[in-house]
Amino acid sequence: MTNIRKTHPLMKIINHSFIDLPAPSNISSWWNFGSLLGTCLIIQILTGLFLAMHYTSDTMTAFSSVTHICRDVNYGWLIRYLHANGASMFFICLFLHVGRGLYYGSYMYLETWNIGVLLLFAVMATAFMGYVLPWGQMSFWGATVITNLLSAIPYIGSDLVQWIWGGFSVDKATLTRFFAFHFILPFIVAALAGVHLLFLHETGSNNPSGLSSDADKIPFHPYYTIKDILGVLLLMLALTSLVLFSPDLLGDPDNYTPANPLNTPPHIKPEWYFLFAYAILRSIPNKLGGVLALVMSILVLAIIPLLHTSKQRSMMFRPFSQCMFWILVADLITLTWIGGQPVEHPFIIIGQLASILYFLLILILMPITSLLENNLLKW
C-alpha cells in the first residue's frame, strides 16, 4: 500500500513542500528565515486574534481597551507584548531574509523575488495600521503625518487624503477602517506567502555558491526540518526574552499618553523598522520628492534583477561586491539611527549623505563593481 502522504490530494502538496522536497545540501542558516517568517506570521495572527476579542476600535475607548487588555484580561499583557514585539522580530527576520537574497543573488528567481517585494509592502502597511490602533499620541500623530504624505500627489492629493481619513482629520472613521484593514491584511500576506513558496518550488532553492545544485540534492525532511526547528527555538528565545524582560525597549513612551489632537509630541517618529525609510523621506526638502524617495527606497528592490551585471550569481566569490554590500548594510543602520534623531544639525546633512549613498550604491556602485570583477577575472 502506498503512503497516504504521497497519494492524498492535500497531503501530497504538503509532502512536496515540506517533506520530500529536494533541497541543496549546502544551504546555510541564512536560509532559515523563510520558516522563521512563517512562524512570525502565525504568532502575529494568533495573538492578534485574541487581542481583537477585547479591543474596541472607537476613539473614545480604544486606548482604555488596550489598558483593559493589559490589566484585566488573563495573560492579556503577555498577548499584547508578544504581538507588539512579534512585529519587531518579524521585521528583523524580513530584513535579514531580503539581505540574504541580495547577497546570494536569489533575486534571479524573478517571480519569487517580485512576490517578496509585494509581501514586504503588505507587511509594512499592516504594521503601520497596527501602530495606529492603541490610539496613543504617537499612533495619532504617526497616522496624521504618514497619511498626509499622500496630499503631495498632484491634483487628487487632498481629496485622496480626506477619502482615506473618512473626514477632515484622523478620527473615528479612520481608526475603524484601519482596524478592519489591519485584521484582513495578514490573511492576504499568508496567501501571498503561499504564492511565494509556489514560485520558489518551481525553481528550487538557491544556495550560497550560486551554482546549480541539481547534482547534489537532499530531502527537506529530516535535515532541514530539524534545522528549522532550531531556528524557531532561537527565535522564540529572543522574542520571549524581549517580552518578559524589556517589553517597551523598542516602543515609544509617547504612546502611553492617550491621543490628543491639540498637543503635538516634540518628535514624531515611526517604529524603529520604518526609521530608515523615514530618514530618506525627511532628507529631501520637497514634499513630493520626499514621498517619491520614500516609495523608491523599497521599490528599488524590484529593479535589482535588472542591475545584476556580474557573470556570477552569488557574492560568495566576489570580495569587492561583498565590500559594497556591507557598506550598504552600514548605510541602512546609519539611516535607521538618523530617522530617530531630531531635524537639526548635524543630523540633517548626515541623513542627506546617507540617503544619496543608499541609492548610489544600489543603482550605480554595485553594478559597476560587478563589471569590474568580471574584467579582473577576464570573463
Curated annotation (Swiss-Prot):
Q: How does it sit in the membrane?
A: Multi-pass membrane protein
Q: How is the cofactor bound?
A: Binds 2 heme b groups non-covalently.
Molecular-function GO term, any one = metal ion binding
GO CC aspect terms: mitochondrial inner membrane; respiratory chain complex III
Q: Which residues take part in binding a ubiquinone?
A: H201
> Which cysteines form disulfides?
none
Q: Where are the transmembrane segments?
A: 33-53, 77-98, 113-133, 178-198, 226-246, 288-308, 320-340, 347-367
A Gene Ontology biological process noted in the UniProt record is: mitochondrial electron transport, ubiquinol to cytochrome c
Q: What else is known?
A: Heme 1 (or BL or b562) is low-potential and absorbs at about 562 nm, and heme 2 (or BH or b566) is high-potential and absorbs at about 566 nm.
Oligomeric and partner information? The cytochrome bc1 complex contains 11 subunits: 3 respiratory subunits (MT-CYB, CYC1 and UQCRFS1), 2 core proteins (UQCRC1 and UQCRC2) and 6 low-molecular weight proteins (UQCRH/QCR6, UQCRB/QCR7, UQCRQ/QCR8, UQCR10/QCR9, UQCR11/QCR10 and a cleavage product of UQCRFS1). This cytochrome bc1 complex then forms a dimer.
What protein name does the entry list?
Answer: Cytochrome b
- Which species is this UniProt entry from? Chodsigoa parca
This protein's gene is called MT-CYB
